[in-house]
């Protein structure tokens, strides 16, 4: 008997919607990253994208514990000398509410082409409305 290996063309992908209101950033991100990889499925294969599509709504209402709202820093660099920019969690949520969740989940996915394909299945929206009603996403609670 041989080991089962999932084939990319036979993978069944479902759509799920997650409400991030009041959820802790890291705990939400670990569950979402695991589902994007497909680790919750019995046919999980590390080198095949077996994960589901995840739609996250109310991203602006995600929270962090302790003093991280003011202390947690996010950095980016333009590539030019002296081109480093930084902002804290509060500033990033005010400017781009989807960014903290996207950054947290992206850091938990594999680096490389497979991880980029997994990340493309994540859809994050600041408010409660999303344009994926046609896919009939199921509610997912953590």
Swiss-Prot record:
One of its GO terms (molecular function) is structural constituent of ribosome. Belongs to the universal ribosomal protein uL13 family. One of its GO terms (cellular component) is cytosolic large ribosomal subunit. InterPro entries: Ribosomal_uL13, Ribosomal_uL13_bac-type, Ribosomal_uL13_CS, Ribosomal_uL13_sf. Coiled coil: none annotated. It holds the Pfam family Ribosomal_L13. The keyword Ribonucleoprotein applies. The gene is rplM. Part of the 50S ribosomal subunit. Keywords: Ribonucleoprotein, Ribosomal protein. The keyword Transport does not apply. It comes from Pseudomonas fluorescens (strain SBW25). One of its GO terms (biological process) is negative regulation of translation. This protein is one of the early assembly proteins of the 50S ribosomal subunit, although it is not seen to bind rRNA by itself. It is important during the early stages of 50S assembly. This is Large ribosomal subunit protein uL13.
């Amino acid at each position: 008997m041989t080991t089962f290996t999932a084939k990319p063309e036979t993978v069944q992908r479902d759509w799920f919607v997650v409400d991030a209101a009041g959820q802790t950033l890291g705990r939400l991100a670990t569950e979402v990253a695991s589902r994007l990889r497909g680790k919750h499925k019995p046919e999980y294969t590390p080198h095949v994208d077996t994960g589901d599509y995840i739609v996250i709504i109310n991203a602006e209402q995600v929270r962090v514990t302790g003093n991280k709202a003011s202390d947690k820093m996010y950095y980016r660099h333009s590539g030019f000398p002296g081109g480093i920019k930084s902002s804290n969690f509060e500033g990033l949520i005010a400017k781009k509410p989807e960014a903290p969740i996207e950054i947290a989940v992206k850091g938990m996915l594999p680096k490389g082409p497979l991880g980029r394909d997994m990340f493309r299945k994540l859809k994050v929206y600041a408010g409660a409305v999303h344009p994926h009603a046609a896919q009939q996403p199921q509610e997912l609670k953590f």
